[in-house]
Amino acid sequence: KPQDRPNVAATLASLSIPLHLSTPEKFNPSQHPEFNQQRIELSPRSASSRIKGYTLSIGAKLVGITEINPLWIYAKRGEIFHENWDDWGREIELNHRYAVVFATEMAFELVGTAPHSSTTIASMANYAGGAFIATQLAAYIANLGYSASANHLRHYDAALVPLAVDAGLGETGRLGYLMTKDFGPRVRLGAVTTDLPLIPDNPVDIGVEDFCRICKKCARCCPSNSIPLDDQEAVNGTRRWKLNAETCFDYWGKVGTDCNICMRVCPWSHANTLPHKLIRALITRNRYSRKLFNLMDEIFYGKKPKPKSAPEWARYE
């Protein structure tokens, strides 16, 4: 729609990252930076601390480390960018043992407008920010003398949600996204795989599976019925709620955005105010709290919450 063009312009601008942050000879943000031949020796504990601290300092909200489960690695390259057709169908060979997985927070005021175009601005801004973080982190590890590969919007060697679960960032929710304690599903993920010896984090239990069994709000509100109302099922050696990706993506095409309705209505997606922080803390600890606050969420916000108005700068004229 013509009145939506300013938001489309902002969405596209969110993906406009510079090709070079310094001189081309100094730094070129590739997925596989050449590593320094003079390796800097670090203990796994020291390396893990430095890597996490650096990742948070350049914009990540959450970061964790895991040993890579081979099941999460994609078999072949399935997306083509910049007419690089030689890459299509190429087998992915990943010899890295560890993954550093991070999350960035999506803006609450933009996610709250889903499925309108302003929510896509938040998505693309986080994809671009994640690309920056992954690229810089991969370069940092390479400068230490180790092999590294940046995983972001334009390059994925592995499925990031199960990697993030293994790295202790959260649990997989009914809607198929990673559910984090502090932001719910309102995050975007990135990762760097590496052979730098690190100390893995442990998966966490924050009560997501139990809460999602009770809630089902994302499934009730999904306009394409892509999120199951049933229980988890066995899928490729895992047990999870199986999203219908085809009908979900088809609705994206119809609505012209990446929808995000499930993310908007999720009770874990509320702003990080003191009351909501307290509620999340109780939900992670007590099953009865999950039932109580699920009921309270429906009382205060409704069974099918309506989208909020976009910020003034992102509204239709």
Sequence positions of predicted segments:
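Iron-sulfur (Fe-S) cluster-binding modules
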Residues: 1-70, 74, 78, 264, ...
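Catalytic cores of enzyme domains
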Residues: 52, 61-285
